[in-house]
Amino acid sequence: LVCSRLLNRPVVQSRQDIRPFHIADYDLHKFDPRDRETQKKFHLYFKNRGIDLSTQYAFHRHFCLATKYDAEETIHTCLAFPLTLPKGDGTVVGFEERDCVRIDGSSNYQDKAEEGNTNEGLWIVSPAQTPLAEAKHVYWFESAYDAMAYYQLHQAQNQELQKAVFVSTGGKPIEKQTRDVLELTIPATQHICFNNNRKGWNFKRELQQEICRTVHSAIEETPERKP
């Protein structure tokens, strides 16, 4: 497992190792824009990332604090970004978990919960609640934190960002994830905002290739050009 990660090889869990995701197994604390008391618990999570309150308001429907007992009956709480399927009905199929903290105060950084459909699920968000299939602009990120930070930096100069759709892959993009989004958003402009490092460059190249494949497969030959 460690060697695979060092060599940037995908780590694939066998189906029997992937635990089913049940949102009812979690105690959820949500951000209410009309109740300052509900907002206070999020302060430390977002303060450390430089995410201001107005940005939290813009994305408040799409994050929460998720608390769950692990196998040793130890409570841990994470900032959770719900994952949904691009072609689904909005049902939450997993979490992109960030900054997990156990009850003893120890922390455990995670990209995604070790359960649920994280191979197909994505964090798919629009501040203006634009449906994915109606998006004119789609912005791709490796984490939900990155997406929120980008919005915060650019929304004053680009009011159209409110209508855009932000997608977080929660790490390495998986072909099934990207293909389902692209098939729904062929007319949209795809903005690739992955990290500016070797992994990010590789992710960008893979997504560009998938964009080309998706667009090419959608082109229908005219009768004059068909063999």
Give residue ranges: language-model regions.
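Alpha-helix N-cap recognition
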Residues: 1, 143, 226-227
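Short, small/acidic-rich helices and loops at N termini and domain boundaries
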Residues: 1-4, 63-64
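Basic, glycine-enriched DNA-binding surface that flanks or lies within the catalytic cores of DNA
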Residues: 14-117
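Phosphate-handling DNA/RNA-contact segment within nucleic-acid enzymes
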Residues: 73-183
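TOPRIM fold recognition
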Residues: 152-227
